[in-house]
């Protein structure tokens, strides 16, 4: 990841381990929050957050919380030509940390909804492909 919403490319090496949150630092997508489930190369245009094992917050909870706050994070952008988010501004985002048990309950609920959304997106994509195929067959 080097900022942005999708990877800017792929590389057989990495400098950031899996289970990391990245936040796009610059450009039109600055403030975009993403969970990285595999090792990746973190470029200079994203911030990465890795939770220490002794922390009282879990990575999945922090990801869902920051994703919920994403509009507020995006509002931190400054500059007009190539907007960016300054680390000092990002560090001011207030994070509410419930107990670890409450975090786990929230993660279970939110993960269920996330899986439902992903399944609906796949279903919609497949329907669109079928539609395109059927339309192309009508006008041969």
Across the structure, where does each feature detected by a protein language model lie?
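DNA target-recognition domains and sequence-specific DNA-contacting regions of bacterial/archaeal
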Residues: 1-97
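Amphipathic alpha-helical coiled-coil/heptad-repeat segments
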Residues: 92-140
């Amino acid at each position: 990841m080097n900022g942005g919403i999708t990877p800017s490319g792929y590389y057989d090496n990495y400098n950031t381990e899996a289970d990391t949150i990245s936040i796009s630092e610059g450009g039109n997508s600055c403030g975009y929050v993403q969970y990285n489930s595999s090792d990746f190369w973190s470029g200079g245009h994203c911030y990465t957050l890795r939770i220490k094992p002794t922390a009282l917050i879990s990575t999945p909870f922090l990801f869902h919380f920051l994703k919920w706050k994403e509009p507020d994070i995006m509002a931190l952008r400054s500059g007009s030509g190539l907007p960016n988010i300054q680390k000092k501004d990002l560090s001011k985002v207030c994070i509410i940390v419930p107990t670890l048990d409450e975090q786990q309950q929230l993660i279970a609920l939110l993960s269920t909804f996330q899986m439902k959304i992903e399944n609906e997106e796949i279903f919609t994509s497949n329907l669109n492909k079928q539609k395109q195929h059927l339309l192309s067959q009508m006008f041969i």
